[in-house]
Amino acid sequence: MVVRDYNTELTYIERISTNSFRIKKGFQPNMNVEGIFYANSRLEKLMFDELRNSCRPGMTGGFLPGVKQIANVAALPGIVGRSVGLPDIHSGYGFAIGNMAAFDMSDPTSIVSPGGVGFDINCGVRLLRTNLFEKDVKPVQEQLAQSLFDHIPVGVGSKGIIPMNAHDLEEALEMGMDWSLREGYVWAEDKEHCEEYGRMLTADPSKVSMRAKKRGLPQLGTLGAGNHYAEIQVVEEIYDKYAASKMGIEELGQICVMIHSGSRGFGHQVATDALVEMEKAMKRDKIETNDRQLACARINSVEGQNYLKAMSAAANFAWVNRSSMTFLTRQAFAKQFNTTPDDLDMHVIYDVSHNVAKIEEHIVDGRPKQLLVHRKGSTRAFPPHHPLIPVDYQLTGQPVLVGGSMGTCSFVLTGTEKGMAETFGSTCHGAGRSLSRAKSRRNLDYKDVLRDLEAKGISIRVASPKLVQEEAPDSYKDVRDVVQTCHDVGISSKCIKLRPIAVIKG
């Protein structure tokens, strides 16, 4: 690999507009398409500082800078359009988190890469609304936070309380939210307000290892640790009244609940198993990549198909997981307010995935094409009138749920036509890390983080207090910059801003 100085690297990066940058071919070897990334002035500085630091003599180890990872993805076989870096981008395994790429299904050389989905398959967010207001919740805020903490199993080794045996797990992996509906854990309309209606039909549990199933069985209906959370939130601003009203959000001060979780150890094992198989497939099929973390297989190879079927099962696991936590959240609220979830109007606004690969139809060079779209740390954001979004949102565009860092605001956005054309209907997913977990642990004290949250009037319940500094707001980019950048470039539109009043974490 040629090592260039920082100024030479910059000759390959060109500003297209105030908030968008082109990465030219040649920045990394064998690029089939260009790269693009979106950043405002503050986010841009973080991107270029990361690149500058990587150019220093003796800088080895760790992940490559985000711009390099975008360019390495642009060199993968079968990629179309551009390799896209969203404003929340940060270095990850293979693909950067916040990197999106689409591959032509009709090209026999096209690949699927587990690094383009991530280890937490279908890590995603679900948002529930209520008919409660901040004034209703404030007097019982601490009790409600405790009730949620008591109802939802949280933390690294947390075990689920939803009854589950091996046969149930097989069915849940195949059926996704249809299993949750049959078992009485969700309402029929919950499914309607869920990406893919909460079920990937391509799931095949027989392609999942026994080890993954063993890890997954006790974890269904658990929040986990890391950046996962359940938050009680207050509607602080409404930017698009019409779209918000379609979501059942009419007034400031309304209470919502956001659940952010994924496929736990199950998804991690599916990804780990696939990477081992794909390294063998790459040797056999003579596939070369710029980075060995970009292990991949031809989409139509046995390994590629096996991964997609197992990944779909992990996606279903995550939807069942969020559904189980929806059930527990409704129970906690009903118990606290001595009424029913129905009377509290606890409907699902939407549920989105942040880590997944899916076959979708997009326009490429003026013609519709079937593409395998990898979204890692990015969110599907389809525009109004798209056939794959619910009837309720046909006139507004798909809701996009963007979680902030702990104690900061979250946002609901909507998909746009421009996003469909520029980013294959994709936008940001969250704040995006600016400090690694190790640096966060070194630089921040968890007691200070907890004190800051209390000073903001936020109730906090956390299973592992010492993990809190990894998720402190100072470890992340400012989610407001991320969301505003997406809004300004037109790939999504701001709809609702939510402020946390209680945070439940692993």
From Swiss-Prot:
Gene3D superfamilies: tRNA-splicing ligase RtcB (3.90.1860.10)
Residues the entry annotates as binding Mn(2+) 2: 123, 260, 354
Residues forming the catalytic site: 429
Domain of life: Eukaryota
Catalytic activity: a 3'-end 3'-phospho-ribonucleotide-RNA + a 5'-end dephospho-ribonucleoside-RNA + GTP = a ribonucleotidyl-ribonucleotide-RNA + GMP + diphosphate; a 3'-end 2',3'-cyclophospho-ribonucleotide-RNA + a 5'-end dephospho-ribonucleoside-RNA + GTP + H2O = a ribonucleotidyl-ribonucleotide-RNA + GMP + diphosphate + H(+)
EC number annotated for this UniProt entry: 6.5.1.8
Alphabetic keyword roster: GTP-binding, Ligase, Manganese, Metal-binding, Nucleotide-binding, tRNA processing
Amino acids binding Mn(2+) 1: 120, 123, 228
Gene Ontology biological process terms, A to Z: tRNA splicing, via endonucleolytic cleavage and ligation
UniProt keyword Kinase, yes or no: no
Binding note for cofactor: Binds 2 manganese ions per subunit.
Residues annotated for GMP binding in this entry: 227-231, 354-355, 403-406, 410, 429-432, 505
Cofactor: Mn(2+)
Molecular function (Gene Ontology), one example: GTP binding
PROSITE patterns (alphabetical): UPF0027
GO cellular component terms given for this protein: nucleus; tRNA-splicing ligase complex
Family statement drawn from the similarity comment of this UniProt entry: Belongs to the RtcB family.
HAMAP family on file: RtcB_euk
Assembly information from the UniProt record: Catalytic component of the tRNA-splicing ligase complex.
Its job: Catalytic subunit of the tRNA-splicing ligase complex that acts by directly joining spliced tRNA halves to mature-sized tRNAs by incorporating the precursor-derived splice junction phosphate into the mature tRNA as a canonical 3',5'-phosphodiester. May act as an RNA ligase with broad substrate specificity, and may function toward other RNAs.
Identification of the protein by name: RNA-splicing ligase RtcB homolog 1
Provenance organism: Culex quinquefasciatus (Southern house mosquito)
